[in-house]
Amino acid sequence: MSKANTTNARRKNRVRMALRRTASGRPRLSVFRSSKHIYAQVIDDLKGVTLASASSLEKTMREAGNTGADIDAAKAVGKLLAERAVKNGVKEVVFDRGGYLYHGRIKALADAARESGLSF
């Protein structure tokens, strides 16, 4: 494993362990970012179930003209995810940035989810 991969894996594990200590039973909003798309899901770790999910690959997102690799797509995914989570009865979550810096697309997704009804 290269040094960069080792560093990223350690950061991801450190963030994830800090979340587990402070979660106190709340579902986790997990984010994955690739170079072309962004994915987010609300996961109940106690039951091992995904409660809501959204990504820039969905048909409605592609029809809207979002490329998936920009801040506008991240905002749309955050808004859609929050709407689906609230519809399923989830209002409080723990934000799992997955080792990514809280900046750019990650921050845009988090802000859009907060504006649409999730609290974290």
Curated annotation (Swiss-Prot):
Pfam families: Ribosomal_L18p. The keyword Nuclease does not apply. It comes from the Bacteria. GO terms for molecular function: 5S rRNA binding; structural constituent of ribosome. Keywords: Ribonucleoprotein, Ribosomal protein, RNA-binding, rRNA-binding. One of its GO terms (cellular component) is cytosolic large ribosomal subunit. GO terms for biological process: translation. CDD domains: Ribosomal_L18_L5e. This is one of the proteins that bind and probably mediate the attachment of the 5S RNA into the large ribosomal subunit, where it forms part of the central protuberance. Part of the 50S ribosomal subunit; part of the 5S rRNA/L5/L18/L25 subcomplex. Contacts the 5S and 23S rRNAs. NCBIfam families: L18_bact (TIGR00060). Belongs to the universal ribosomal protein uL18 family. This is Large ribosomal subunit protein uL18.
